[in-house]
Curated annotation (Swiss-Prot):
This is Anti-sigma F factor. It comes from the Bacteria. GO terms for biological process: asexual sporulation; negative regulation of sporulation resulting in formation of a cellular spore; sporulation resulting in formation of a cellular spore. InterPro entries: Anti-sigma-factor_SerPK, Anti-sigma_F, HATPase_C_sf. Its EC number is 2.7.11.1.
């Protein structure tokens, strides 16, 4: 996702406020719209953006609006690469955090399904985190649209 590689890409940064989650979803959907994704593909992508951004806000920054969430999206042929990053508190036990129904904030009545949803809705999923060093979630999805073959 770098300039000059022939790929199309975008980068977006915003305050770690819950109201920005919808903005992030719409921005990513608008950017990938030229690939003419199906409604299911678009819904999947919007859902994973919501999950990743919400994780950054709630878990990474503990709902501190001074934090910054970064989204990077790259398009190469028919493949979308999506990266959501924060410089928050990081995840102590990433493997535990990836377990379905696990949540570090049970008082918020969250389902603990964010990573599971991201992993199941995307073709590739990788999370990297270090306690005190933030979290980066990188995902890829191939768009089935015929239009994607010509862009």
């Amino acid at each position: 996702m770098r300039e000059g590689t022939g790929n199309n890409f975008m980068s977006l940064q915003f305050a770690a406020k819950s109201e920005n989650e919808a903005f992030a979803r719409v921005a990513v959907a608008a950017f990938i719209s030229r690939l003419d994704p199906t409604m299911d593909e678009l819904s999947d992508l919007k859902t994973v953006v919501s999950e990743a951004v919400t994780n950054s806000i709630i878990h990474g920054y503990d709902s501190d609006p001074s934090g910054v969430v970064t989204i990077k999206v790259g398009i190469e042929a028919d493949v979308i690469t999506l990266v959501v990053e924060d410089a928050g508190r990081g995840i102590e036990d990433l493997e535990l955090a990836k377990q379905p129904l696990y949540t570090s904030k049970p008082e918020l009545e969250r389902s603990g399904m964010g990573f599971t949803i991201m992993e199941n809705f995307m073709d590739e999923f990788e999370a990297v985190s270090e306690p005190g060093g933030g979290t980066s979630v990188r995902m890829k999805k191939r768009i089935e649209s015929k239009k994607a073959l010509y862009n």
